[in-house]
């Protein structure tokens, strides 16, 4: 009960945050539509339609809470973030703290971008502030227009359920990490004995989890024992019991721990580094690669490569598979951009990924199989024997890719395609 209450609280907190980006954005769209890039204008108009048509009382509450908190939250965020980061930006770019405050107020009241994104998208750089309206946010995509497109297209192939995803891929000969077994409310599903029987490193994660939350790594130490990243030792039956207990809150699945291709291991920090490759259906309903980044775990994280959990990401030249400078999430401008991995010292910038053509082909083939979705963010691992699907995300976090690529998607190819499909399906999602 406590777990479900916490999940519900976090869900509404994220929804309130998303709604808070909408007030000024929608007001400016109504007053000054020509100030928005054409694609961003179309996307924001669709967002406006969804914004003012809450599906239930909970969404009305989210709007009311966001409206009450938004002005105070904007002011408080500006003061706190400028105190925290203003000195670094002033020293590196010559933008005074007063100017930074003014920039953040302007962004919040003209584009809906809340103060943290001023630093995430580095809009303090000369000439960058004017691009604010072209950046797409979670509120305007993941929590609204992406869902509208999914409903309009009748999207139903399993991207949210990792267990069903693996089965779906296996039936279509798509390389993916196999599921050894799953546990639902304490019940084991799949072929597994009481002693577990897998003399290999294991990886546990929620069937419907996101962001790497709840994932656990257990390395096989021999004689039927497994060791966690934190040093806990469990026998095989004890590990089964642990998964049973975890599954009482949400279903879990167990996979063998995959390891990167030898040409990438010095960038992985002993976790599994994956390529987040964003694909979208074009005007002819054929998948097209929009952009890609390589995610890499750093510091003490040897379990997941999630950027929001502190990992770094490097942009990938989609034609040749060449890496650019890597970056953190951007919430701390002191960290900036780096050419080498912080722990291993291995070169990132200019490096070419192995098996890149095969990875691109797999992403396009996968989207063809999941063709009822307009946009998918694929996590693909480059293993010794080839690229392998880890998961697909129907609600891909746009900010995860916009920052490393230094691209505002509202004025890019993705924006064009989203606008095209929103226009084409308007007669459906307006019903």
Give names to the regions the model predicted.
Residues 183, 206-208, 222, 256-258, ...:
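Short, flexible loop/turn elements at secondary-structure junctions
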Residues 3-8, 336-364, 368-375, 382-431:
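C-terminal active-site "lid" helix and adjoining low-complexity regulatory extension at the edge
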Residues 295-320, 324-369:
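Acidic/His-leaning functional-site neighborhoods
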Residues 202-239:
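Glycine-rich phosphate-binding loop of ATP-grasp-fold ATP-dependent ligases
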Residues 1-65:
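Intrinsically disordered, low-structural-confidence terminal and linker regions
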Residues 198-200, 230-329:
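Phosphate-binding site of ATP-dependent enzymes
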Residues 212, 274, 295-301, 393-405:
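Glycine-rich phosphate/pyrophosphate-binding beta-alpha loops
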Residues 60-197, 209-210, 363:
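Conserved N-proximal alpha/beta basic substrate-recognition cap immediately N-terminal to
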